[in-house]
Amino acid sequence: MEAQVFLASGSPRRKELLTQLGYQFDVLSVDVEEIHQEHETPLMYVERLSKDKAQAGVKAIEKTKNKYTPVLGSDTIVVIDGVILEKPKDFKDAKRMLLALSGRQHQVMTAVTIATPEKIRTKTVITQVWFKTLSEQEIEQYWESGEPCDKAGSYGIQGSGGRFVSRIDGSYHAVMGLPLMETDQLLHQFL
């Protein structure tokens, strides 16, 4: 069956969630530099990255595939006190982030963009997440599991990092990397 959409992401979580929605899709590998600009608020940043990924996907398929097939780009960031927590560079970085989140509330922002050469639409979901207080031992054991290495904010809610979450207000799937309802609504505008 022909793809209904191209997913401009290598994230296994986004692949899993798009599959859950029941869409036929192909994965595109896009290279987008993820550098926060000084003038950007966290919201502007996550939306720009989402759009950049979708537009890079549109450019990638223009010459080789059906250029009218929509491309989905998405990005997720973790924000506490207005500071963006990216993927950790090493254990020290992950520990710094997890200690900052420990016992506190933070935001997870996920932007989803669908693009074709003629049209682009973006939706952003902001979810409030509360963490329990973490011990240094919990942080070390979590790091040793390998799970935090490729995750914004150094945790994955869908894995063992979920044990740190005491409450959420918003979309669980957005925290994972792709809000289901909003993604489905966007795709319906294109299909």
UniProtKB/Swiss-Prot annotation:
Q: Name one GO biological process term.
A: nucleotide metabolic process
Question: Which reactions appear under catalytic activity for this entry?
Answer: dTTP + H2O = dTMP + diphosphate + H(+); UTP + H2O = UMP + diphosphate + H(+)
User: What is the annotated localization of this protein?
Assistant: Cytoplasm
* UniProt superkingdom: Bacteria
One Pfam family named in its UniProt record: Maf
Q: Which residues form the active site?
A: D75 (proton acceptor)
Cite the EC number. Answer: 3.6.1.9
Q: Which cofactor does it need?
A: a divalent metal cation
Task: Site (Important for substrate specificity): give the residues.
Answer: R13, T76, Q158
Annotated GO MF terms: dTTP diphosphatase activity; UTP diphosphatase activity
As for what it does, the entry says: Nucleoside triphosphate pyrophosphatase that hydrolyzes dTTP and UTP. May have a dual role in cell division arrest and in preventing the incorporation of modified nucleotides into cellular nucleic acids.
Question: How is this protein named in the record?
Answer: dTTP/UTP pyrophosphatase
Question: Organism source for this protein?
Answer: Aliivibrio fischeri (strain ATCC 700601 / ES114)
